[in-house]
Amino acid sequence: MFHAGTPLRSLLWVTLSAIAAVAVAIGIAFVVRYRLDDRPIVLPRPRGPHPVGRVLVDWKDARRNRELMVFIWYPAVDGATGPRSEYIPGEWGRLEAEHMLPIPAKRLEQIEVSSIRDAQAASGPMPVLILLPGMGRVPAHYTTLAEDLASYGFLVLGVTPTGSARPAVVFSDGHRVEGEKKPRLDDPAAAQRLVETWAGDASFALDRLARDSRFVVRQEGAGIFGHSFGGNVSLHALAMDPRFTRAANLDGSLYGDPLSMTGKPMMILCGEVIDDEWKAPCASGAATCAAFPNAEHMDFSDAAAYPSRFPIPKRMLLLGNVDGPEFLRGIADRLRAFFGGARLQ
């Protein structure tokens, strides 16, 4: 019971404390409910005519002293059956799950994908796309896009950037390489070194794929696309490897050296607005560009497929006000159209 002589400051403090306590209680209730929810997260199903296979390979680049874990999504033979791939398998998946807040660890491990583990590949030849993730991410975080593209006939090489993927990359023999926590992207020289390393990884993956007898691929070049820093690298890669004939950037800013204009087709898709550094190539017609006013940065990843079950506001997770699965389908459609469609021969 407050009396007339109670200081206003005390009343205000009590009121604010009560509001804070209620907010904390509501927040805890949401988190508890979310963590007790055992429903698995099911990613959107691919829409194309082909079943999708996936293999995970450990490739060593002796020339550059690099080792890479590469996710390969591809069209499988008609009628292919078998166990589904794990979203991120084994110890790597467990390590990733421990650090993927606010998603409870067991929920990340139970994400349901459509690709069949180690399924026999269709006879091909298949057009090839390189997929580069955002900084700190791994290609599996873009499974929805990769599976949809593969179901329409593309072979998608998701290259994990060793030393940049966080918290770590776990290799087939169990050893791990931790990712740099604070890459110096504001230093143009340091950023350019990363651009060259990631682009070198993409080129090596193309070299190594050509020696993999499981896949028959088209020889007339490859496309490359990525999200965030991976999208930035994709555009740079056009000038670094003549085999890359087209590149798409999903909401990535420009880092490293100024972009070299090669005359090769580019596509730039941004959340909310076109970044200032891309306005010149967009205006000149050097790049095909589009912005999505209601989308945020992480809507270009699988995170868009399950934001409604997060117990915190989507904006805090860099997620916008879009229908996540529908948005990803639209991005996949744009990628497929830009890279020319795919028909197995």
Kindly give the residue locations of the regions a language model identified.
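N-terminal membrane-anchoring alpha-helices
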Residues: 2-49
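Domain-level recognition of soluble alpha/beta enzyme cores
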Residues: 32-129, 317-321
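Short, solvent-exposed beta-strand-terminating loops
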Residues: 75-92, 159-172, 287-309
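Short substrate-entry loop that stabilizes the transition state in hydrolases
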Residues: 111-126, 131-169, 274-275
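Alpha/beta-hydrolase active-site loop
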Residues: 163, 169-219
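Primarily recognizes the serine-hydrolase "nucleophile elbow" in alpha/beta-hydrolase
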Residues: 204-262
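The feature captures the conserved acid-bearing segment of alpha/beta-hydrolase catalytic domains
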Residues: 245-302
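C-terminal catalytic-base region of ester-bond hydrolases, centering on the histidine
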Residues: 285-345
